[in-house]
Amino acid sequence: MVFTVSCSKMSSIVDRDDSSIFDGLVEEDDKDKAKRVSRNKSEKKRRDQFNVLIKELGSMLPGNARKMDKSTVLQKSIDFLRKHKEITAQSDASEIRQDWKPTFLSNEEFTQLMLEALDGFFLAIMTDGSIIYVSESVTSLLEHLPSDLVDQSVFNFIPEGEHSEVYKILSTHLLESDSLTPEYLKSKNQLEFCCHMLRGTIDPKEPSTYEYVRFIGNFKSLNSVPTSAHNGFEGTIQRTHRPSYEDRVCFVATVRLATPQFIKEMCTVEEPNEEFTSRHSLEWKFLFLDHRAPPIIGYLPFEVLGTSGYDYYHVDDLENLAKCHEHLMQYGKGKSCYYRFLTKGQQWIWLQTHYYITYHQWNSRPEFIVCTHTVVSYAEVRAERRRELGIEESLPDAAADKSQDSGSDNRINTVSLKEALERFDHSPTPSASSRSSRKSSHTAVSDPSSTPTKIPTDTSTPPRQHLPAHEKMAQRRSSFSSQSMNSQSVGPSLTQPVISQAANLPVPQGMSQFQFSAQLGAMQHLKDQLEQRTRMIEANIHRQQEELRKIQEQLQMVHGQGLQMFLQQSNPGLNFGSVQLSSGNSSNIQQLTPINMQGQVVPTNQIQSGMNAGHIGTSQHLIQQQSLQSTSTQQSQQSVMSGHSQQTSLASQTQSTLTAPLYNTMVISQPAPGSMVQIPSSMPQNSTQSATVTTFTQDRQIRFSQGQQLVTKLVTAPVACGAVMVPSTMLMGQVVTAYPTFATQQQQAQTLSVTQQQPQQQQPQQQQPQQQQPQQQQQSSQEQQLPSVPQPSQAQLTQSPQQFLQTSRLLHGNPSTQLILSAAFPLQQSTFPPSHHQQHQSQQQQQLSRHRTDSLTDPSKVQPQ
């Protein structure tokens, strides 16, 4: 019993121990599991952080185009850190001592400030005098661009009297190879001398001016200088110079002005096209200045408000600025010239301003002027000034070596035809980029990225000749006009050379397919331009040929035409106008004998004999007789009837009196542009009445007896009364008309008809007094039917004998005038036989004494219009 109890106790104890052990094991497993979970979490977090750091480190390494594993990233990081440690050690050796350089300034800024404070610039010269480097600060001191000095000899800028001394200094102070030590910055090899240097000018024709300067420097060997201390200096040396010297020794000096400049031009432009805005009053006082101005000019807005802009301008630019401002006041907007503005740091910066005037919105009065100022470099200013002076300045060959490697200089602007033509003209010689960077290059000794951007090429390469734009256009037009005479072949002749050159143009080494396709596109554009110009030239040629054909037709029409000379006396002076006859039968023209003007009968033979023989006395008597007879006959109106009639539509003007022709000119007092003069060319042989001129009002018409005739219609154009025109036999197509004397007659039409007939049978002089009485009665009856006409004064109708005397002397005394008259008139002297001529000469006095009413007919036969 007891054993049984004990056994049960023991079994219960064992069961309890097993359960406790199991529970303990379960607890331990739970603890281990929790530890593992926490450990895994921490490990995952650590791995994630490590991967993030590796990824970030890989992104900072160069050449991370492809995905790198962790070991590669770590290896490159180690290499970079090792190289950085070496560079840092070398930089510490060349670092400017901190005891005299402010900590907030970099080496680059400190060097620039030191050069400005010393009024100096850096210059690197080879032992033979070739300049291989010059700093930008030379512009503010000597007004030279760095590109003007680089690759030039220093002796070109030194007076001839100092050449020998400077050459001796450069050639005798050479460093030996054993003396080159790492302590090259020390002054044991320092060289110092003084000389004169040439100042730069905008106009090369100005007289030379030299500045006294001091050279302080050392001879340095580039082989002993650490690469990090080159500062990009090696990259600035021309490639043509690099193999030219074996020892790589040059003289690096600081050039200082002996006389310091207190105000200098700012030689560098940190950012291209920097600009700021300001507002000015009409008196040019500052009213507003934006936030971009202080970093450029140094002034805060409150420092300049209320001050005049002219206080900050250079004295040499005031005159040009005043002209620009006057232009602004006249036109309301404009652009100024380049001018210098004084900054707060006492430096001159070059600006160009675009301005316009704003007006008040209510009263439209000028309110203020808005200006936008742009900072420009001295290189742009000098180039613009030289273009104004007519000096062609070639573009600086900036970065020529780099452009040769990259092939970027072979690109053709597909928009500009001019540049494409220049490319084809100068295809063997590569050119530099047309636009160089305006970013300032600094002169520091530790920044390898600060290198100049304007380095010219070797001087052995001949520069491209630049012609003015108008000369290029003239040459191009002349070449086009010479080739366009053959319109059938001008197109192929212009385009085939371009196409063949495009086909044979090799692809330069290093040029991409895109660049070559750009060239082909430019050539195609050039071809289209040439074809379009060819079509325009062909159209111009066709138009000119058509005009030439019309001119030839007009010349044929006027060729061989005869001329008639008429003289009108409307004032005491003589006025002449041109009269032209159309081509017709010359025999009919030569048969015209008498001329009836204002009732006067003057035979043509008398005029011809008076012109050829020079009977001055007879001519004077003839003019006096004609004037007296004209005065007596102006009191009546007359009409003429014959077998055939001719009508002309010109309104009358009674002050006009035609006398015998002396010149081949005629003046018709008529302001109306639609007036016409009709002159018959032939007359019947057997006519019993002589035609006269009858003057009516504008609602009447005149009828004349005519035979077969040839009429020329001449459209007249008004000119001044004093104009005299003597047309030639080839180019005659107008009649010059003079304005009438009185304004009341300017709106009236005028009718004038001149007929020529064969001479009638002359009547004895004794019968004329007997016929005067019936003729006067007939005239009085005719005046009752016709309207009254105002009578001219005796002074207007009388021709001065002295004028006729001078005219006769002019005709008979000048052989060239007789030659011109003989060439202008197709009438031949053989037409009038000598006997017939003498017969008319003997009857001259009888014809002068006749009254103009001998040929009057019955007034009832006149048919009014």
UniProtKB/Swiss-Prot annotation:
Q: Where is this region: Interaction with NR3C1?
A: 371-864
Give me the ranges of the annotated region Disordered.
420-494, 620-653, 755-803, 822-865
UniProt-listed Enzyme Commission number(s): 2.3.1.48
For the modification Phosphothreonine, the affected residues are 451, 461
Q: Where is this site: Important for interaction with BMAL1?
A: 84
- Molecular function terms in GO for this entry? DNA binding; DNA-binding transcription factor activity; DNA-binding transcription factor activity, RNA polymerase II-specific; E-box binding; histone acetyltransferase activity; protein dimerization activity; RNA polymerase II cis-regulatory region sequence-specific DNA binding
- Alphabetical list of InterPro entries matching this protein: bHLH_dom, CLOCK-like, HLH_DNA-bd_sf, Nuc_translocat, PAC, PAS, PAS-like_dom_sf, PAS_fold
Q: Where is the composition biased (Low complexity)?
A: 478-493, 755-796, 828-847
Return the protein name: Circadian locomoter output cycles protein kaput
